[in-house]
Amino acid sequence: VETLKADIDEMARLKINAFHWHLTDYPAWRIQCKKYPVLNDPSKRIQGRDVNGTYSYDQIRDLFRYARERHVQIIPEIDMPGHSTYFKNCFGFPMHDPRGVNILEELLEEFCREIPAEMSPYLHIGADEIRIPNGKQFADRMAAKVKSLGRQPIQWAGNNDLPVSGDSYAQLWNDENSVGLPDPARQKNPYFDSTAGYVNSFDPGILVRRNFFRQPCGTARGNNHSLGVIQCLWPDTRVENKKNIPVQSPQWPAMFAMAERSWKGIPEDGSRFAGSLPEKNTEAYQAFSLFEKRMEALAGSRPFPYWRDSFVEWTVFGPVPQDRQEEVRNNLLAGKSPAGLSPVQTRGGNLYFRTRAGAEGLFSKTKPGNTVWAETTFHSPVEGTMHAMVGFDAPARSTRRCSGVPAAGEWSQCGTRIWVNDKEMKNPQTYKLAGQRRYDKHTWNSPANEMPFDNEEFWWARPPVPFQVKAGENRILIEQPYTGEFQSWGVSFIPVKKAGDRWIADPSYYAKPRREKQDDVSPVP
């Protein structure tokens, strides 16, 4: 509860005014239950998943009051009829069984007696990721029950969810493969937008860009139909140390960008800039660059795995199939332009070729078996050591599908190579999990998902890499093969410097100091 209170403090500071509290899921019913104490029996819960963790009604009321004092409305979710393994463990039948439906109504009654409507005017009933024979009847009955208890029901509204009741608000969602925007005209129910992608699915760069450039709810301004944005974080892989959640899933950088865009709105959608930043000197680029600076200044002491990257410049060559790799590599190292390849000029230290689901990137339609080279040139005033955040893939926190931790001396398990001033450089960092944790398939409902992540599985949670540079111009060439669709294909390279106990971006390698406008601008892509 104390962790949640600290999170609510930060949400209030960002003017985020709602907290969607997911109180039940596969492992357990986390709410104190007086009518059916078996729901709080540790032996009925999924073992290894905080089996003793239950919120008392006193704790729940206390958190509601705490949030309300900070102008944050809690939206509790009691997920039904899916995501409820614990329920069948307790009663021997699923929620959508007639006996289960009766029990659910009693549970809703108890919750609403304990948590009054003036404290909790909304109640989310889940209804996602499940197909049952009586789906519409189930959703309608549960929504009507919530309505009769003086609450506004809310349901998830994805492709594999139960039909949304006419009484409910809809919560639209997508995960890694989310493309396009909600169309307000097609939404029968008032709706929340959760289609920007989950915080647990992406790296820091693309999360910030998605939330900053995307048009919330598919409309320039909110209204009584287009209600607002809810950002989702589902660390489905077992978490051992809860303090690692905001380190492994960059919730605060993503929430900064979500708050910025949700409050200001945007006249036109700029989702195309998530995979590749807008050109320099455009209004959209300048607005994003200024936002990065503000975000860096306001990051504070919270876990904040984001380094502004819009200043990094690239020349990109490719993609080419495997049989041309050596030819192109040799040409680039010799300073020649490879035949038949038109270089692409782009910006952003987080450089995306194809995100894991293919939703974004410079080469989002490219298939595995191809390779891309990224070249960046920068200036160092002196010979010495430059540090940079460097990475090439990372798993979603809901599943382990990923190329894994680099082996000793390697940059990735995908054959990544780096040359500094035409001399190949091996990775100077060695990890305790070197060469491990490679999974080319999803690990949901498998023993692998019960193994907690280590921070070193995420490039943004590792220490920066030292590079030896010369005085004057330096060139770094990165070769990045695409080995399989389990891989998030791209390059992250962001020069950083120490500022107190934190590492912050160091743009001095790319530009001379200059006075920059510090006013507050929203982009018009």
Please state what every model-predicted region is:
Residues 366-379, 460-465:
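Short beta-strands within extracellular/lumenal beta-sheet-rich domains
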